Amino acid sequence: MDFLKVSDKTTIPYRSDSLFSLNQQQYKESSFGFRDMEIHPHPTPYAGNGLLGCYYYYPFTNAQLKELERQAMIYKYMIASIPVPFDLLVSSPSSASPCNNKNIAGDLEPGRCRRTDGKKWRCAKEVVSNHKYCEKHLHRGRPRSRKHVEPPYSRPNNNGGSVKNRDLKKLPQKLSSSSIKDKTLEPMEVSSSISNYRDSRGSEKFTVLATTEQENKYLNFIDVWSDGVRSSEKQSTTSTPVSSSNGNLSLYSLDLSMGGNNLMGQDEMGLIQMGLGVIGSGSEDHHGYGPYGVTSSLEEMSSWLAPMSTTPGGPLAEILRPSTNLAISGDIESYSLMETPTPSSSPSRVMKKMTSSVSDESSQV
């Protein structure tokens, strides 16, 4: 046992083999240092219990002395094989961190939950280890969890898909090429396939056929026209018109020189059938003339209806070309102009004479 002289009248026992025996030089070289800690100017005597019942010369802060006392008490309980109280096991924040000593006052009941109502009430439950609150009040200080923000709403389909995310896969349209067999136009079938469209009730493929009844009607007319072209080509080698069994002229044997078109227009043929009585109109008088004094005999009409008797240039050339083959009929009452059957005659010339005869009759009356 060595004795350390503090003053002339006081002697303090000092144990060199103590658990906390440190000399002053070792403390200066420790991590604490003298700059960061509040150091007592004089050695502070510390009275402990049991093995630590001795006085220490070395300077410690108040927080360090309290922590040493707590550890000494825990050690004493462990040696005596007694359960350590909960208050000793939980270290207060003030003792753990000396820097918070000035801001936080020491808790009188460190093992008790620190949840209060701000006045006198305080929770009586024990705190959770390494926390300040009990299990009930442990998460009260944290902000409440907010509800998860959902993405922008997109209306789902009946099939579970989304209208917003819709894939349109375009397919090339298929068009069947038209084929001509034996110089005849066959009905052309046009099939267009609409792209793979996914509507609100599911994905379906629609196929639209462009062949309708109206188009079939036009195609049938084209077939008739092609037959007429074929028959006119066969008849072009002969100069005599082809007549049917009942004595009427064939529809496709009537052709005019209309700028390279060997087929008479539908409107012109209708005028001949309706007004002039070419094909069996039954309106001829006893002189053999049709309405408006125009002859309707089949022999005379065949002279300008034949394919080889047409004049080049069409109706416009016939009007501009001077002609001296006009003969006035002997019938004074009708004053009808009739044309002798010459190769230069045409329906346009007949129509011109028809209008002149009508004007003469109106002036006579």
Curated annotation (Swiss-Prot):
A motif (Bipartite nuclear localization signal) lies at residues 112-122, 140-147. One of its GO terms (biological process) is response to far red light. Belongs to the GRF family. It comes from the Eukaryota. Residues 137-147 have a biased composition (Basic residues). The gene is GRF7. Residues 137-187, 332-365 are annotated as: Disordered. One of its GO terms (cellular component) is nucleus. Induction: microRNA 396 (miR396a or miR396b) negatively regulates growth-regulating factors (GRF1-4 and GRF7-9). Transcription activator that plays a role in the regulation of cell expansion in leaf and cotyledons tissues. Component of a network formed by miR396, the GRFs and their interacting factors (GIFs) acting in the regulation of meristem function, at least partially through the control of cell proliferation. Coiled coil: none annotated. Signal peptide: none annotated. This is Growth-regulating factor 7.
